[in-house]
Design a protein with these regions (language model features):
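Residue-level preference for well-ordered alpha-helical positions
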Residues: 76, 88, 108, 169-170, ...
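Short, surface-exposed loop or secondary-structure junction motifs
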Residues: 45, 98-319
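Short active-site loop at a secondary-structure junction
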Residues: 16-28, 47-109, 148-160, 243, ...
């Protein structure tokens, strides 16, 4: 495509971000090794209406992982570390998992270690815009004395491994991760505006202020009761004071220099093997590739090799994607939390759209599957019972909300995924791609008892329920103080208007101070559905049928229910 036509199309793709009094993005595009597009849209600071440009500094969040991994790679190149090195040889406190964890397992995310962010935010109730210190991170890491799977058995995205890699850099070099990365990566490449922030009070020149929708920050009643404001946006920032998994602050201009280094390495020995190391996926125990390199996803995009990684945290979103064989790249930095839904490769994201332009791909819609689906939908009327309503899987606490639109049912789960289901007869529905089967079980009175889901080889059972306010006398047994000694965190459970209010005893850590409505048995569901989803809490009883504990249930399968809050009074 001609350069002028390409730039015109790129402007069309990005124009929705060109708004006054609204956050925006910085976009850089490289084609065949040449920078063809570099532009800012929207505002870096809404207080002073400062516009975004290529020198605006953004938090690029999880894009930090590739820089942390590069630090480790440099130390391996020096002979100061090895891939098969046992991490407990550096940090003895990690031996409590009972299994050898290697640097290889951390780099390629084949470790199964629980995510410290899940523990901090979704168990301890720390707010997204609060600071988390190094000591707090270590407390959460050592409190998780289990793994999801054996080392190297599976791949699972997580932040803990890269936090530990950052700590390994500091332990080996006797300097901070921030200083080591600056001396050995940023300065050699001329990335003069890039740094790893380990001090939330740091003054950042030309910083883009981070923003979120008002309800994203002020989602619980303990905030809203003090304000009648109707703002659409709020300032937001993830004030974590430790690097490794995140906290990379950078500019579009600097990331373009980083992108160039993939083709002509200027770090340390200048070896091309170093770049190959960064961009080659790791292997599982069975010899299969895991799809993840050193802080970079590695895959295929319409027949082209692609390396890429996104970033998301309070107030910011980012994405970097490179087609190395075509020497073409896309870099996007934004100062709004929800921009993460626009970037990346889901639902035709911005990065995907730009990459398609670069490779000359024309997206032609294939109506074949849709036509086939329409034929199946004609049978929808044969199912007489009304499926609409809420359902819960008591094992995982995952929720469904089933709705009906134009004689077609849609299943929306706790994570916001919506699945169109089609009727195949004999009380059986299937997803449009036929990968999921939903079997409706009814009693002799034709009342739905449950829906059985088969997703691949896995089965789960969802039971219908109605949220209900129940008499205060029945709720009284749940009241009291509950404590998790592992985390040094306590919650109070009180009754209010037929609901339970669970509140952190540390009033500053109020992210999970929510009202809960009764759902089924001893499970309660939060009234508010935000970025934390519909939150579930299940209480446990002893042999005398007395309430003895509660846990936060976990439909994301990170096992946060392993943290038990025991009733102490």
């Amino acid at each position: 495509m001609e350069k002028i036509k390409m730039i015109t199309k790129l402007n069309e793709v990005c124009k929705k971000y060109d708004r006054k009094d609204y956050p925006g993005i910085a976009v850089g595009i490289v084609e065949n090794g040449e920078l063809i597009f570099s532009k800012g849209y929207g505002e870096a600071n809404l207080d002073y209406n400062i516009l975004i440009d290529e020198n605006t500094v953004f938090h690029a969040c999880s894009m930090a992982k590739q820089f942390t991994a590069a630090c480790i790679a440099l130390l391996i190149e020096e002979g100061k570390l090895s891939l098969d090195q046992d991490v407990s040889s550096i940090f003895s406190q990690l031996k409590n998992s009972g299994e050898k964890v290697t640097i290889y397992n951390l780099l390629y995310m084949t470790n199964g270690i629980p995510d410290v962010y899940d523990t901090a935010y979704f168990v301890c109730g720390i707010r997204e815009d609060e600071g988390i210190t190094r000591d707090e991170f270590w407390r959460y890491v050592t409190a998780c004395d289990w793994n999801f799977f054996k080392m190297g058995e599976k791949w699972s995205y997580g932040n803990t491994g890269y936090f530990l890699l950052g700590q390994i850099v500091e332990a080996v070099t006797k300097t901070s991760l921030s200083q080591y990365a600056d001396e050995h990566i940023f300065k050699p490449l001329g990335m003069n505006s890039t740094f790893i922030r380990d001090d939330r009070t740091k003054i950042i020149k030309k910083r883009a202020v981070g923003y979120s929708n008002y309800d994203h920050v002020h989602y619980n009643d303990s905030y809203k009761r003090y304000t009648s404001r109707n703002d659409k946006l709020s300032i937001n920032d993830e004030n974590v004071e430790v690097g490794g998994a995140g906290q990379i602050w950078t500019t579009l201009k600097d990331l373009l220099l980083w992108d160039k280094n993939f083709y002509n390495n200027k770090l340390r020995r200048g070896s091309s093997e170093f770049i190959k190391f960064l961009t080659t996926p790791g292997l599982l125990n069975n010899g299969k590739e895991c799809g993840y390199g050193l802080g970079l996803f590695v895959g295929e995009f319409y027949g082209n090799k692609i390396v890429h990684h996104g970033g998301w945290a309070g107030g910011y979103s980012a994405y970097y994607a490179q087609l190395p064989e075509k020497k073409s790249s896309v870099i996007i930095l934004g100062n709004h939390t929800d921009f993460m839904y626009d970037f990346g490769f889901k639902n035709g994201g911005l990065t995907e759209g730009i990459l398609k332009l670069l490779i000359g791909y024309e997206n032609e819609r294939d109506n074949t599957e849709e036509k086939q689906s329409d034929n199946i939908n004609l049978n929808q009327i044969e199912f007489d019972l009304n499926l609409s309503g809420e359902y819960i899987d008591q094992e995982s606490s995952c929720l469904w909300n089933i709705t009906k639109k134009k004689d077609i049912y849609y299943v929306e789960d706790s994570l916001g995924n919506s699945t169109k289901i089609l009727y195949y007869g004999d009380s059986v529905f299937k997803s449009a791609d036929k990968e999921k089967t939903y079997t409706v079980v009814q009693n002799n009175k034709q009342i739905i008892e449950c829906v059985k889901l088969q997703d691949g080889g896995a089965w789960s059972v969802y039971y219908p329920f109605c949220r209900e306010k129940i008499d205060a006398s029945k709720l009284k047994i749940y009241e009291g103080s509950y404590r998790c000694e592992k985390l040094n965190v306590s919650y109070n459970v009180k009754i209010h208007d037929g609901k339970l209010f669970i509140r952190n005893e540390n009033l500053h850590n109020n992210a999970l101070d929510l009202y809960y409505t009764h759902a089924i048995k001893d499970t309660f569901i939060s009234d508010h559905n935000s970025h934390i989803g519909n939150y579930c809490t299940t209480f446990s009883r002893d042999l005398n049928n007395e309430i003895v504990s509660f846990s936060y249930r976990d439909y994301t399968k990170t096992l946060r229910e392993n943290f038990i809050f025991m009733k102490i009074q």
